[in-house]
Amino acid sequence: MLAEDLNTRFASLSVLLRAASALALASAAWAIALPAHAQASAASGEGPAQAREVRAWLMRSHEAASHRNFQGTFVVSGGGAMSSARIAHFCEGPNQFERSESLDGQARHVYRHNDVVTTLWPASKVAIVEQRTLIAQFPALLQAGDDRIADFYEVHAQGVERVAGHEANVLVVKPRDGYRYGYRLWADQASGLLMRADVLGEHNEVLESSAFSDVVIGVRSQPETVLAPMKKLEGFRVLRPTLTPTLLATEGWALRQPAPGFRLVSCVKRPLGGVGAAEGGAAEQQAVQAIYADGLTYVSVFIEPFNAHRHTRPMLAAVGPTLTLMQQQGEWWVTVLGDVPAATLRLFARGLERTKQ
């Protein structure tokens, strides 16, 4: 029962963040981290010409994740585990198309057309179709937080290194407190595409590394390779989880003290009992999910009714940089999840209060 509750239910969300969406997320982070870098440059005596050069580099990295066509093999390692996937991204005007196929463990194919994501599990013949508006908006939400980045992170350029056969500029992002992790990022010099991203612990150790082992940039756009499998679902049991916008106050909750720098960016209700109800199925019990972001990373708070059969004991578990804190709070079961230190999760959990019975 340890990781079989909300962790399992939202596994596909984590996979997407770790793979295809990781490119856009990290690239967006580079773009919004610029104010901190500008301050660091001024303090170290770097001139305005160099600051402008870094600004252009960061913005190009952000644009590359959204507007470049590329395909390659993406590898994620951390916590003694490693996984890989074949990833392709195509852009035609305002439309974006992505596909990700796992190369390890159980076969899993993920296809995205803008904010519609279809996940196929060939072995079990299950298809999950989701309107992942939250995921699609994450880069924009993070960019909106650029006024806070300099307060909580320092950003520095750190030379050039080679990744997957490409010369890449290196950026180091250091936290100013103990409530968040640091990052080291690599971007292709020619295109700006993010090539590698490391999550760094408090002692500068690598908690997780996500990188291309091979990638071809500028490939021909092939949206049909994404759209066709999204439509061909014969023989699959199709599940369509739905997200319903809400507010913590509406659900009878309040967060009195989020970690410094984190702001609420979304609050929804989503179905329990697996990833959702099958087409035409009855409505299921729901969990409340509130997402908080500091501009570079996020924390999710899940609240569901306590169930003694499923919620056997409190726990704190780690998978790479992702920590999960689960505990009972009265008649409720609270799960706090994020790529942040344990102190951050505990602060969120302590600040959560029930405002109505």
Regions picked out by a protein language model, each given a short descriptive name:
Residues 2, 39-125, 151-200:
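N-terminal mature ectodomain segment of secretory-pathway/periplasmic proteins
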Residues 121-141:
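Acidic/charged, solvent-exposed loop-and-adjacent secondary-structure segments enriched in E/D, K/R, S/T
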Residues 12-26:
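Sec-dependent N-terminal signal peptides
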Residues 1-15:
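N-terminal secretory signal peptides that target proteins for export/translocation
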Residues 191-193, 200, 204-223, 335-357:
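Surface-exposed amphipathic alpha-helical segments
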Residues 234-330, 342-347:
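Short, solvent-exposed recognition patches
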